[in-house]
Amino acid sequence: MLQIYNTLSKTKEVFTPLVGNQVRMYVCGMTVYDYCHLGHGRSMVAFDVITRWLRHRGYDLTYVRNITDIDDKIINRANENDEPFDVLTERMIAAMHEDEARLNILKPDQEPRATDHIAGMHAMIQTLIDKGYAYAPGNGDVYYRVGKFAGYGKLSRRRVEDLRIGARIEPGEAKEDPLDFVLWKGAKPGEPSWSSPWGEGRPGWHIECSVMSTCCLGDSFDIHGGGNDLEFPHHENEIAQSEAATGKPYAKSWLHCGMITINGEKMSKSLGNFFTIREVLEKYHPEVVRYLLIASHYRSPINYSEENLREAKAALDRFYNALKGLPEAAPAEAAEYVERFAAAMDDDFNTAGACSVLFELAREVNRLRESDLSAAAALAARLKQLAGLLGVLQLEPEAFLQAGAEGKVDAAEVEALIQARLEARAAKNWAESDRIRDQLTAMGVVLEDGKGGTTWRLAD
């Protein structure tokens, strides 16, 4: 029985789809003005694991994740680069897809772009105006009338009265109320714009997601996700817009993943304390980064540090060493392990608990390989199958154990040195054998001499 924590109700609930076995999920994606940082990677990986588990449980899932390809940040960066905004966004979208592929993230079923849904935004905004939830003051802008929506604040548990304290209308804004937010922005010189019933302009951020989600999934759908920094105001405003426009409940369940922190602060571009996924992958294998992101529960914050990445590498080394050198086999039934893994994942996608079960499996594989190689191989196959539901442990063990972060060690050179060492040992030239081992150690290579010969891996 799958249970998920719903930010809307602030409780863990038994998950029941709105329609039969169909699950429709929308997740807020990237604003594509720069390379993805590790905080974006956290959300990508979290909802990738959720996608994998929902499908494993037999749900007919439609997963939609949008791309925000018009925004103040995009315009500013394009101006800084002296390039058209769409040239910038195309480059960043391609880079995002490359990062995702390296982190073994499955593609969403649909990836709508904001600029492809301008007409739908016009239609929803006009509906809101017709219903009295929005107004056009005549300066090219259109605002949402927050005070008219009775349910405002129900997601974030904020009270309108409290929000008004200290709120003010900025110069140039034509709001009726400081809390009102923009749906359509009148055109400014030098900015991209689209024609509309209210003049040239471009959409506000919040209306983009309301339109893309309902266009792809319908007025009401099962799951809306994103980082917990989006809960307010973005997701709160989405609810206000969508439910006012359609007259129906918007998303049934809201899932929010925790942030990546550095010294207790959220990793973000605005704070300047971020590392791009690409920068981290220059030092660490992609699977190490993915494991770091799944080793904690998706709602918990993750503190970024070199120590935590080294621990993730060490954990994967233990797993792959357990899988190494075993023959192919059909997965063992391993009912107890399978049931406990499923129980963890059914408990609000508790990947930390699921990883604990995988460690127990790995220990049992290591115990069995000394006495019953076929049983060890079958259990290892089950370990690999379960880990695959988290998107890890799918490489050949030797390939992972011998892989640097971007090929920092030349495998051919290592193999040649190992062969030279074997020849030195055969000739009883122990001094040369020790010299070669010391050279390999200095390269970060660990040798393991066994009955089947010498294997190697990179040091933790």
Swiss-Prot record:
One record GO biological process: cysteinyl-tRNA aminoacylation
Enzyme Commission no: 6.1.1.16
CDD domains: Anticodon_Ia_Cys (cd07963), CysRS_core (cd00672)
Cofactor: how and how many bound: Binds 1 zinc ion per subunit.
Placement of sequence motif 'HIGH' region: 30-40
Annotated motif 'KMSKS' region, positions: 266-270
PANTHER family per record: CYSTEINE--TRNA LIGASE, CYTOPLASMIC, CYSTEINYL-TRNA SYNTHETASE
Subunit structure: Monomer.
HAMAP family found in the cross-reference section: Cys_tRNA_synth
Family of the protein in this entry: Belongs to the class-I aminoacyl-tRNA synthetase family.
Protein name according to UniProt: Cysteine--tRNA ligase
Species this chain originates from: Pseudomonas aeruginosa (strain UCBPP-PA14)
